[in-house]
Amino acid sequence: MHKIVQGIEDYAGQAMAGVPAEIVAGLAERVAQEIREFSEGQSDHIYQLVKIGLGLSSEKNIDRLLERIVREARNFTNADGGTLYIRESERDILDFAIVQNDSLGVFMGGSGEVISWPSVPLRLGDNGENHRNVSAHCALTGEPVNISDVYDAEGFDFQGTRDFDASTGYRSRSMLVIPLRDHEDEVIGVLQLLNAKDRETGAVVPFPVHEVGMVMSLASQAAIALTKMRLVR
């Protein structure tokens, strides 16, 4: 880290010629501290992912596994809510498997209350693929979707989300949608996380861009564990 500070000081000294040395040194130390904190945070995240992966691979009960996938992803991102969809390829749909929301006290699917909500179609009759629904779009493209505020999002239909909010008094805002890819790189499900919260203030914030790749890694571990359990059964 000393070399990083020295390098920043050298660069800053050239870029800020004429500025007192103590100011340059102070700025360099501040930048180095931010780099240090980011690196430590990344290491902690990687350690968490390893622990989560081991936990998922050792789970023997399908209901507990599904619940744990959502719970671990929510804990990792500090998300208020999470939904897990399982893809039914033969019928071209996404079935609700797990729905969790701390603020609303909702814990459905798995070993909890049965989910009676209609499935999400991946195709819309003769109109082709369903890219209006964000989870269907994620399943079809295999790409993550990170939205700061669903009420301002373009390209997707969030009327159902607005209706849900109106009926419950909730306010859906930030959303991260991640595909679950198995060992053959096939999308077997979709993980949707809702309303990331600042760990210090509790305010709803966007999902950090640097966490997307790590959540995708978590989702891949979840998909492999789920596929393994299906094969064993």
PLM segments and residue spans:
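Short, hydrophobic-rich beta-strand element in sensory/regulatory alpha-beta domains
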Residues: 71-74, 80-88, 92-97, 135-137, ...
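GAF sensory/regulatory domain recognition
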Residues: 83-129, 152-153, 191
